[in-house]
Amino acid sequence: MGTQKRLLMIDDDPDFVEVVAKVLVDAGYEVDAKYNPDEGFNALKTGDYDLLLLDVLMGRGAEGIMIARKIGDDPVLRETPILIITGMREQIAFLFPGQPVHPSFVPNDELIEKPVEPDLLLEKVSALLEASAKRKAETESN
């Protein structure tokens, strides 16, 4: 895989984080976990992460949505791919790349539903990291 990719996971369920992090670490990724949305967002701002895995429902409600929107508004952080991991796909309109922007959509690059299938998780993480690397290479060559 070359250099080890750093992933940040923001989810308030330690048991879920432990299972998902083990799958990712066993696949060769470095995983940092934050269980509080504010700590997670601060870690993302100060760390050098290649991908964010983000839960929607945390703490006082749909705080993951607020984090995704903050990331979308930040000129540096918006380049970080976001993989939403949630059990509430039907209740929220997610915005995927290439779709028209609507104010109620949540910006993200991909979504996976809980419970997470390990092979699907690894497939989506790999695809997002490859797409991000390709975008960075294109940006740097211009």
Residue ranges and their predicted role:
Residues M1-R6, F105, E113, E117-N142:
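Non-catalytic signal-transmission and effector/linker regions of two-component phosphorelay proteins
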Residues Q4-D15, V20-L24:
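Conserved acidic segment of CheY-like receiver
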Residues D11-D12, D55, K114:
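Acidic di-acidic motifs
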Residues G28-N36, A43:
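Short hydrophobic/Thr-rich beta-strand motif most characteristic of the beta2 strand and flanking loop
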Residues D48-D50, P75-P81:
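His-Asp phosphorelay/catalytic-motif detector in bacterial-type signaling
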Residues D48-L54, M58:
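Active-site beta3 strand of CheY-like receiver
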Residues A62-M66, R89-E113, D119, E123:
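Alpha4 helix (beta4-alpha4-beta5 surface) of REC/receiver domains from two-component response regulators
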